[in-house]
Amino acid sequence: RRQRQMCIRDRNWNFIHKGEKMMNFDELADLLFPSIDKTPEYYEEKYPPRQLKEGARVTRFAPSPTGYLHFGNLYTCFASYLTAKNTGGVFFVRVEDTDQKRKVDGAVDAMLKGLEVYTVKADEGVIGEGNEIGDYGPYYQSARKEIYQTYAKSLVKQGLAYPCFCTAEEIDEIRQQQGNDDIKGYWGKYAKCRDLSFEQIKQNIENGMPWTLRLKSPGDIEKKCYFDDMIKGKIEMPENVIDVVLLKTDGIPTYHFAHAIDDHLMRTTHVTRGDEWIASVPLHLQLFKVLGFKPVKYAHVAPIMKEENGGKRKLSKRKDPEAAVSYYSEVGYPAASVNEYMMTILNSNFEDWRRANQSASIYDFPFNLKKMSASGALFDFVKLTDISKNVISKMSAEEVFELSNAWSKEYDEKLAVLYAKDEQYAKDILNIDRENKKPRKDLAKWSDIPDYISYMYDETFTPCYELCGNATNELAKSVLEKYIDEVNLNDDKDAWFSRIKSICEPCGCTPNVKEYKQNPDNFKGHVGDVSTIIRVALTGRTNTPDLFSITALLGEKRVKERLTKALEYYKENK
């Protein structure tokens, strides 16, 4: 067991348990941080506790500007956003940009745009590249260097942190020496710089030796750390004994140190993050303790899973296009569809709630972190598609047009051109069967529209005369010869259908489907087969929305032209 040192402070001088004078920590702090003249008390006063109602939660989205927004980011962010929103709290955005080498230009704006698309709006924090609002900033970590160093200096003054002059090569040697040790890292007998004297430290600094600042961990190798995760429940882990780096050689903090200080000063109450960070919780709780902070509550989210070859794997940024949030915009899934789907995998009881509250906003749902999956939600494209079809079916034609038109201008120039020719015509097409008691659910995404409406435009219509059911080419020839003479676009729907039924008997069919089923050998088909022949002639398809509405929109000239061409085909291909 590592021997625990008991520090006794007498004014500015510090002693270990044997009474040996070791270090003036105040002098050491001034040596390491000569330009830092503020104290933690200054920042505690500058960023006071938030005046919120009891139970209100303060959450955050804290991305690194190193790439695109992926689905896992959005999923975790949505959980944080709902947690704050449902409790009357605060949701803010903080950019963790301390690693400037990995920073990608435009990444912040791209991520914020992604959040905006999916209706996640921050109450404070970063709202654009270099632009922020709120009283608890700066919200860019790169602008908070003085804050971190103030708390670092305070730890040095308390004998809780020390400078380390070990090189990368020396750290590698330590790793090799540790071999198969259970605990690997800079700790115990391997922490070579832990007990350097003031004179040694001063000499090293005067010699220009670079240094990092390390935590003097108070952890005990035989003790456990206990915490209650909001998603995974009670967790037990060994205490942290590693003297981790707090500040790198350039004075920039590590994630661990910055996280503790930022979430304390920004008065965060709940941190929702990926479960890859569970291993760091003992360290983070230890940092909160040595800094004198009240710890946040953690909710560790399992990764989104995907079925593959009978098993499951993590949704991959490299393998799966749907891992990128931009994918859903590119193919045209409405944001409302993605949000609705996301709610079903965030909380399993959402679907029951939705059935009972069909017109309610998703933000009325009583989201609960504790009801998130502890083992990882399964991404289901089929379910997303079904949900999206349902969402789009409830939209008005005007809304479908506006959203798909905006999408087409960015992703489908040909569709944008079709729309621009006659916007009202496009809206009328999209309105077919939309106002029924049970609207059709043909569209799952905006990229489905070009094919869905293609037969309504001559330049995109591709004739196809393949029939189904009882319809034969010979019957089609007979039906079209008679129907061409019957076409009258002044008819209402009942009159139009009566004309179709009137040509059934002359063609050897029955206008009564029930009669056909009772005596199929007596007829060549029924009124449904006759309608299918007309449908195929006009649209090239056996299944479409309401044929009467399609006929009315196409107009008499185009209807007769298409019927004539189809008739010619069936005459040549009996």
Q: Across the structure, where does each feature detected by a protein language model lie?
A:
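N-terminal Rossmann-like or analogous alpha/beta NTP/dinucleotide-binding catalytic cores
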Residues: G19, M23-N180, A279-F293, S337
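Active-site cores that bind ATP or allylic diphosphates and position pyrophosphate for catalysis
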Residues: S154, Y162-H300, M305-L315, A324-S326, ...
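Glycine- and acidic
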Residues: T59-T66, F92-D97, L265-V271, E322-A324, ...
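Catalytic adenosine-cofactor/nucleotide-binding cores of aminoacyl-tRNA synthetases and other
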Residues: L291-N470, T539-K574
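Short, small-residue-biased leader/transition segments that mark boundaries at the very start
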Residues: R1-I8
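Residue-level signal for inorganic ion chemistry
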Residues: S80, M111, L155, G159, ...
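Helix-rich, typically C-terminal accessory recognition domains appended to large enzymatic cores
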Residues: R499-L554, R558
